Amino acid sequence: MQNYVDAKFRILQNQTKDDAFIFWNDDPIIAREIAKRHPEATLYPFAETHENGVKGYTENNQVVIETANGTFTMEQDLLALTGTHNLYNSLASGIASKIVDIHDEKIRASLSDFTGVEHRLEKVLRVRGVDYINDSKATNVNSCWYALQSMT
């Protein structure tokens, strides 16, 4: 497992103080590795709830992104994609967008009308009130769990 973690964290080797490292703050493995590696990049953690130092989070049904370029907010219910994993993806992409100073209106529009990608919780059709969804990318237990969780 550590070899896999080391491979994923190689990205930090070439990052400088001028770069951004956006990461999920709630994962204890990520937290441990960041503490161990002392990255030079500016850290942009995100989490489901507001904690000290977190740059992307939800609070009172609002998605909140805080960077040096300002604060972005939008109603969580307006996110186009459902599920916790898609919330995390929205927080990460929102942070990246604010870092490069994309206008709030464009971020809001993107997060509220993004249709997803093929084979990932792709809505195929509805027949007699039953939704048929193509999630053929969910090839492991974790992917299936997040997909099913997003439907409740």
Regions found by a protein language model. Give the residues of each.
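AMP-binding/adenylate-forming catalytic core of the ANL superfamily
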Residues: 136-152
